[in-house]
Regions:
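Glycine-rich N-terminal segment of FAD-binding domains in flavoprotein oxidoreductases
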Residues: 28-54
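A glycine-rich beta-strand to alpha-helix segment
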Residues: 32, 40-41, 45, 120-147
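Short beta-strand segments
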Residues: 35-39, 67, 104, 130-133, ...
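A glycine- and small-aliphatic-rich helix-loop capping segment at beta-alpha/alpha-beta transitions
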Residues: 48-59, 82, 144-153, 214-216
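ATP/nucleoside-binding phosphotransfer catalytic cores, i.e., glycine-rich phosphate-binding loops
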Residues: 184-187, 191-245
Length: 245
């Protein structure tokens, strides 16, 4: 097993650690391909990147980014679209070029767009893929039961995911959360040279245990990371609390 597991005290330390990894990659390789994620977890990391860009002038002008997923049916300017999230939390604060930003399109011709995104991904291998972790073990929006062979696809969200995201982003309003999404598949995620997963808090402890100590199963999508040659997992004490080894 090639997982490098880093246990830190809390969310702030986890974000700092992840930031160090991303920053040193961008400095070493100014035209790096970054696979990016949304959700509540990377928010502090993105803040640190913006601050560092402002203060230390770390440049993203030759960086390309590829986001994991997008809700289906939200317009770009919807405040909860991932497109909007990424612009607000990261892109508008750094010197990345608009044309270097890639996010799946969550409306219109699904099949064509998935095909186009897959082509883009296979032409641009990611140097690093940032991941959060769903409380049910999903990565991107690859819900439990998704085949490990998938590339970018349309997926119906599980009840638990709708609930989690309602609580975090939609003021608890289940009806406001889109019921489906477009996501990079497990196959696309596994193509990245390095995978960096951050998980914090008690509600992730079960999934973290399965991901690291459980069997590799499509019922817990993140468990596939055990088969990747270069994975860094950053977890806080709460998320690590059920680990036995
Ligand atoms: N599609 C996203 C994932 O990319 C994210 O990693 C996960 C965890 O979210 P959070 O970081 O808010 O716990 O759930 C969301 O549904």
């Amino acid at each position: 097993m090639h997982m490098n597991i880093i246990v830190v005290k809390n969310y702030e330390e986890a974000s700092q650690k992840a930031f160090e990894i991303i920053k040193s990659l961008v400095i070493e390789k100014p035209d790096a391909n970054l696979g990016l994620a949304t959700g509540s977890t990377p928010i502090r990391l993105y803040e640190l990147m913006c601050e560092d860009h402002r203060v230390n002038k770390t440049s993203y002008k030759d960086v390309n980014t590829f986001n994991l997923d997008e809700y289906y049916g939200l317009k770009h300017d919807h405040p909860q679209s991932y497109y909007h999230f990424m612009h607000e939390h990261l892109f508008k604060h750094i010197d990345i070029k608009k044309e270097n930003v890639h996010i799946p399109i969550g409306e219109g011709h699904i099949e064509e767009d998935c095909k186009r995104y897959n082509q883009l991904l296979s032409n641009n291998k990611r140097d690093i893929q940032l991941l959060g972790l769903g409380s049910n073990g999903h990565i991107g929006f690859n819900e439990p039961g998704t085949s490990f062979d998938t590339s970018t696809h349309y997926i119906a969200l599980k009840e638990s995911t709708i609930k989690d995201n309602a609580a975090l982003f939609f003021n608890g309003d289940l009806d406001a959360v889109p019921k489906s999404a477009i996501t990079m598949g497990i196959h696309n995620i596994m193509e990245s040279k390095h995978i960096l997963l951050i998980a914090c808090g008690k509600r992730k402890a079960e999934a973290v245990k399965g991901m690291i100590e459980g069997e590799v199963t499509e019922e817990l999508p993140a468990s596939i990371l055990q088969r990747h040659p270069h994975v860094t997992v950053i977890i806080d004490e709460e998320a690590a609390s059920l680990l036995t080894k």
